[in-house]
Amino acid sequence: MSEKHPGPLVVEGKLSDAERMKLESNYLRGTIAEDLNDGLTGGFKGDNFLLIRFHGMYQQDDRDIRAERAAQKLEPRHAMLLRCRLPGGVITTTQWQAIDKFAADNTIYGSIRLTNRQTFQFHGILKKNVKPVHQMLHSVGLDALATANDMNRNVLCTSNPYESQLHAEAYEWAKKISEHLLPRTRAYAEIWLDQEKVATTDEEPILGATYLPRKFKTTVVIPPQNDIDLHANDMNFVAIAENGKLVGFNLLVGGGLSIEHGNKKTYARTASEFGYLPLEHTLAVAEAVVTTQRDWGNRTDRKNAKTKYTLERVGVDTFKEEVERRAGIKFEPIRPYEFTGRGDRIGWVKGIDNNWHLTLFIENGRILDYPGRPLKTGLLEIAKIHQGEFRITANQNLIIASVPESQKAKIEKLARDHGLMNAVSAQRENSMACVSFPTCPLAMAEAERFLPSFTDKVEAILEKHGIPDEHIVMRVTGCPNGCGRAMLAEIGLVGKAPGRYNLHLGGNRIGTRIPRMYQENITEPDILASLDQLIGRWAKEREAGEGFGDFTVRAGIIRPVLDPARDFWE
């Protein structure tokens, strides 16, 4: 081996309780089927509370009314979040019409939530509607398998409407990788789709009987766009094209953003370059990365179980050589690639296939009929006449894809009539938040409900300093798990307590640098005071084309994070 690994390949010790739960679950069945019929509680009990995550669901409750219900001696208002498996974010208009109807008829909130994992979520599914939602998805060719917990999650793919052939090829690989890494257990089909039990022994040749040590995230990236934020993910296939045709991938492994407040064994980390591989080795390499993490990942401490920590413990070269051994290949040197941005191009883009693509800005991905802006109805009306597909982006926006010239005016009119094409600032387009309150059980501070008014105030600061058309990549996440991807933002707010955030600065526009904590546990007025001063300096002192994050590093306002395992907390 080219490198002496700094730590053991396998962490010995008492396994975490999650490992017991998986082992005893009979390949993810548990007693979910029996629990479904228990009408005494609106939730799932015991291990099933965690097992349903493997089936794409999280048990939540409405935290706005939690105390009130407790005072009335009532259990929390339990309801499920369901996340669909949608590799590359592509969804047909028939599928869209089905999910629109389910959201309206069978969820507490009536909304569809686009996520930065390039799929949609339903919030507020009561227990009685859990089986029907899986059956509805199945009826239109969708499922929620492996969109949560210790598996390979929804596979992302750059939403590139212009280079249509390259997008089509990359999207096919995203689907193939997703299918190849799915669990083989029949538990999902038996419990939700009433498929009969087959008298065979379940086996998981890739994931293993106890699945992965922790969640695992995969992307297919088409430079120069980094819209999927590759450095937030465990395994990334960067598309390398020749004459507009896909020929292979650069592989980057070990990105991840979640941390725990005050736990210095946790840190955000960018992914490491392993090398280039021709297309025919893609699935073998994907499997080799996953099985190496399966066997070497830390199963004693879930806070230290992700691929990024395995790489730091055993060494990048050791991990890479094991992947080569398992896949039966040698990586070629990394091929040149560069990123120039990661935002979506809002509005119409004409593809090289002569079709039009309309990217609609959906603030925080929340699709609902608002007063004067019936977004949900508008998208439903478009879905009824559009002959192409919809594509959800990793920025929580929606593309009406493959619109022929003859349909363009009709679709634009529907979009305008329903408030889907209202003008918004560049700053708003480049701001994003996770869901957080009231449904997320992990939320420490507001995010989705906080961001719109906070963005108003940041826009006012930009205006005050004479740069109203500028933008700063800004992210708010309600807790340090980091679903809002604040740890790749130029301005990242991480929830600490109600009304309080840690302010991180020094990321860059293209998402290749981790920001550092600038101020801890501060309120909105304190954050705005700091930003007012710093944005004022940026407006006056920046170099041509210099983004806010790059300026804060160059001006010495923040020290860049160079080696997160060692200097993230400094």
Curated annotation (Swiss-Prot):
GO molecular function: 4 iron, 4 sulfur cluster binding; heme binding; metal ion binding; NADP binding; sulfite reductase (ferredoxin) activity; sulfite reductase (NADPH) activity
Coiled coil region boundaries: none
Family that this chain belongs to: Belongs to the nitrite and sulfite reductase 4Fe-4S domain family.
Function: Component of the sulfite reductase complex that catalyzes the 6-electron reduction of sulfite to sulfide. This is one of several activities required for the biosynthesis of L-cysteine from sulfate.
Subunit structure: Alpha(8)-beta(8). The alpha component is a flavoprotein, the beta component is a hemoprotein.
PANTHER family reported in the protein's UniProt record: SULFITE REDUCTASE [NADPH] SUBUNIT BETA, SULFITE REDUCTASE [NADPH] SUBUNIT BETA-RELATED
Name the record gives this protein: Sulfite reductase [NADPH] hemoprotein beta-component
Gene assigned in the entry: cysI
